[in-house]
Amino acid sequence: MQPQINLNTKLQNQSVDNSIEPQLFRLKTQLLSKGRSDYTLASTDLMSIRIKCYAKGGENVLHAHPAEDHAFVILAGVAKFSGKEGEVAMLTRNQGILLPKGCYYKFESYGDEPLVMLRVGAQQEKLEINRIGLNGKSLPGKSKENKHEDGVPIEGLYYE
């Protein structure tokens, strides 16, 4: 028989920072005719929430995050996610994918409209290099090697 654990006693022994406040955010981003955008909506030491927009045809290259889990939820458009072995998942509005740390992936905006995604990241340990290519070397997100292209906004058009 397992001993009973008194949750209240366990919680009393934990220190709580009473100064911590919630962070409110809104899912809004300008749509793009070219390139990509990436904005942090809220974050803590362990988690980040970002909204990403990729113009039609926008993409990145196969990479992994050695210390960070990622979850993507498609808000608008179509995303084609590909893995290290060539496996493919086509995701549309309100569908998502969880990519554990170390999982290689890439994605592209596959539909006729810009791709808008919510990205939630979680990591316990901070590493000097947070994104690596297939060769195991650093692959900065905003680099030509990662097919980065600055976003060109479509005047007056937003996802919200």
Regions found by a protein language model. Give the residues of each.
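Short, conserved beta-strand element in jelly-roll/cupin
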Residues: 53-55, 64-81, 120-123
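Short acidic-glycine-tyrosine-enriched beta hairpin
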Residues: 85-101
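A short hydrophobic beta-strand segment most commonly corresponding to one strand
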Residues: 71, 98, 113-131
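Short beta-strand His + acidic residue motifs that chelate non-heme Fe in jelly-roll/DSBH
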Residues: 62-63, 81-82, 99, 105-111, ...
